[in-house]
């Protein structure tokens, strides 16, 4: 992600001695993203990813790292956290919590086709099933409570039309969260940020999901909605690509069949996914933090997506024949 906390090779060389990874040979900052500080590091034993957590606390982090370990042990393709000689997954670096995980093979597929969307859908369903019995419960930290806190903060920066959009959508989502349909939705640990740049492919072969540091317990359908809103759209307009949507949803449904309640909530959850990222991008755009290599995202992208999900009918979650 962006480099908020610089780390030199000398810093790394001293810190890494607590791991069984050999000597540090190289370190390179990763510029994409705006939440944590990430580096590619090379040691005598191979390549890894070092993350320094800028917002999450030492107390919150066991959820994320142990979830990744839990998933990996059950055949879900995710990075493996690396423990120190003492068995610790989380260790202080420059006074902040930090962790090392294995580096996945391949690269992100930024122009996905239906075959890639199907692979992501199937793996996402397997991830939800595998995580269902994960013993640690931690809420989605960008869930409805966070949205209710953040909306008033960004509201003064908005145009009149966007103020109206945000106020109306917040009211809509808060009302839905009180409904019987919402309370029937299946839930558990979710990734919550499964964008194209958080999945690796080697050709058409999916090699793993990564960056689980927005994960939390929420509805599985929200996770599907966030994923569809990124993988299955025309990036210029935000319009859903029907072929890619169908490929992702059908592949997911084949592994973990959707429910009638999820079908009823589908369009609402697509709106919720768009709202969550519109709010976070508005916050980061108007209230940025200092960082090297910072690359803020355009809030207008998810404003467009939210308006589309409100105005246009969406493909069904599943068909009666599915």
From Swiss-Prot:
Catalytic activity: L-homoserine + ATP = O-phospho-L-homoserine + ADP + H(+)
UniProt KW keywords: Amino-acid biosynthesis, ATP-binding, Kinase, Nucleotide-binding, Threonine biosynthesis, Transferase
Name this polypeptide is given: Homoserine kinase
Species of provenance: Janthinobacterium sp. (strain Marseille) (Minibacterium massiliensis)
Enzyme Commission number(s) from the entry: 2.7.1.39
Family to which this protein belongs: Belongs to the pseudomonas-type ThrB family.
Keyword Repeat: no
Disulfide bonds: none
GO BP: threonine biosynthetic process
Pathway in which this enzyme or protein is active: Amino-acid biosynthesis; L-threonine biosynthesis; L-threonine from L-aspartate: step 4/5
HAMAP family: Homoser_kinase_2 (MF_00301)
NCBIfam families from the UniProt entry: PRK05231.1, thrB_alt
GO molecular function, one term: ATP binding
UniProt keyword annotation of Ligase present: no
């Amino acid at each position: 992600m962006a480099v908020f906390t610089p780390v030199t090779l000398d810093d790394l060389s001293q810190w890494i001695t607590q791991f069984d990874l050999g000597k540090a040979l190289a370190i390179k900052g990763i510029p994409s993203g705006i939440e944590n500080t990430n580096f590619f590091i090379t040691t005598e034993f191979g390549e890894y990813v070092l993350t320094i957590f800028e917002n999450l606390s030492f107390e919150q982090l066991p959820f994320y790292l142990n979830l990744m370990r839990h998933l990996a042990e059950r055949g879900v393709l995710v990075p493996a956290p690396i423990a120190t000689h003492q068995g610790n997954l989380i260790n202080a670096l420059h006074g902040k919590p930090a962790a090392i995980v294995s580096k996945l093979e391949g690269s992100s597929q930024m122009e996905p086709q239906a075959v890639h969307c199907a692979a992501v859908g199937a793996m996402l369903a397997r991830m939800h099933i595998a995580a269902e019995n994960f013993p640690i419960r931690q809420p989605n930290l960008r869930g409805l409570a966070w949205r209710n806190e953040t909306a008033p903060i960004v509201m003064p920066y908005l145009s009149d039309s966007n103020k109206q959009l945000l106020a109306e959508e917040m009211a809509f989502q808060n009302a839905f969260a009180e409904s019987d349909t919402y309370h029937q939705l299946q839930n558990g640990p979710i990734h919550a940020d499964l964008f194209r740049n958080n999945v690796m492919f080697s050709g058409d072969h999916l090699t793993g999901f990564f960056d689980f540091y927005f994960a939390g317990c929420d509805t599985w359908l929200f996770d599907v909605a966030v994923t569809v809103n990124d993988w299955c759209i025309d990036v210029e307009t935000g319009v859903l690509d029907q072929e890619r949507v169908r490929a992702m949803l059908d592949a997911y449904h084949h592994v973990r069949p959707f429910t009638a309640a999820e079908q009823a909530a589908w369009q609402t959850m697509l709106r919720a996914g768009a709202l969550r990222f519109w709010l976070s991008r508005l916050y980061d755009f108007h209230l940025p933090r200092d960082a090297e290599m910072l690359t803020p995202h355009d809030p207008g992208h998810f404003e467009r997506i939210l308006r589309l999900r409100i105005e246009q009918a969406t493909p069904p979650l599943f068909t009666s024949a599915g």
